[in-house]
Amino acid sequence: MSMAIKYSVIAGSGSYLPERVVSNDELAVELAQRGIQTSDEWIVERTGIRQRHLAERGVTTSVLATEAARRAMADAGVGPADLDLIIVATSTPDFVFPSTACLVQANLGAKGGAAFDVQAVCSGFAYALTTADSFVRAGRVRCALVIGAEVFSSILDWNDRSTCVLFGDGAGAVVIKAADEPGILAAQLHADGSQTKILCAAGNVAYGQVTGDPFLRMDGQAVFKQAVTVLDRSARDVCAEAGMTIDQVDWLVPHQANVRILNFLARKLNVSADRVVVTVDQHANTSAASVPLALDAARRDGRIKPGQHVLMQGVGGGFTWGSVLARM
């Protein structure tokens, strides 16, 4: 592989959502049967979420990831033989091992390239995209498939109103290719392991038994405070790394956690609401899938145009966060 390659560009995107759409009203009815009280008004007021897509039982992360991958590959005009690298960002893999990326590779009929998962929860796509970009810049690969995919409904405690209304399932993907001109301009990844307990799913499988608490648990107020602080700083730092300012960014594509975080972040960055891609109302929080889902939606509806600058940001359990600035 030539070492002269210096840059990577996003050549295509794709996404996939499970067919089942559950509105807040429908979810409220289901939860009422468990003795949990909520309503569309309660959920929208606190989160901005109006509906979510939920996978049927038995539909795994690799299924969603594969379909998103196929759509991204079609958009980029590449086939399985072109893929030198597949990275899947997920916190809900099909198995302990093999990796979800290897399952996707098999589903696509791709052979021989590297395939592995990364796990940084809702920051996962930023971590995966930055990793793939580094492989391309190093001249190790010419074409990489990067996927964020989750079946978060499988790790929710449906008796916990504070979390079960927030999340959905889905997958988004991009294809990046080697290029002579920069597409991905700058990226930064960070973590603070001292904050593990504010957002976690602390269960495990050991000796044939599930140990610990297998469900997602969250301190919502702590997550909000941490998220808006680190995302603000990260956005400014990654723009500075690229020799740009926030004003020069055409689109902000943040992790779709809830509308309150998105609005607060936009105000801190002095970014107008019409420059922020928002899909959380339709998708809910899809963890590692949220950023590529939002990116693909905005590319396909014509909002994001070639040549525009897009700032993608993730933040999640760990505590982790990351930003990627790209010219489309």
From Swiss-Prot:
Pathway of action: Lipid metabolism; fatty acid biosynthesis
GO biological process assignments: fatty acid biosynthetic process; secondary metabolite biosynthetic process
Region annotation ACP-binding: where it falls in the sequence: 256-260
The keyword Acyltransferase is assigned to this record: yes
Gene3D superfamilies: 3.40.47.10
EC supergroup of this enzyme: transferase
A molecular function (GO) term: beta-ketoacyl-acyl-carrier-protein synthase III activity
Protein location: Cytoplasm
InterPro entries: ACP_syn_III_C, ACP_syn_III_N, FabH, Thiolase-like
One Pfam family this sequence matches: ACP_syn_III_C
Active site: C122, H255, N285
UniProt entry keywords in alphabetical sequence: Acyltransferase, Cytoplasm, Fatty acid biosynthesis, Fatty acid metabolism, Lipid biosynthesis, Lipid metabolism, Multifunctional enzyme, Transferase
Keyword set includes Ion transport: no
EC number: 2.3.1.180
Subcellular location, principal: cytoplasm
Any single GO CC term annotated in Swiss-Prot or TrEMBL for this entry: cytoplasm
Catalytic activity: malonyl-[ACP] + acetyl-CoA + H(+) = 3-oxobutanoyl-[ACP] + CO2 + CoA
NCBIfam families, per database record: fabH, PRK09352.1
Recorded family membership: Belongs to the thiolase-like superfamily. FabH family.
The protein's assembly and partners: Homodimer.
Protein name per the record: Beta-ketoacyl-[acyl-carrier-protein] synthase III
Naturally occurring in which organism (per UniProt): Bordetella avium (strain 197N)
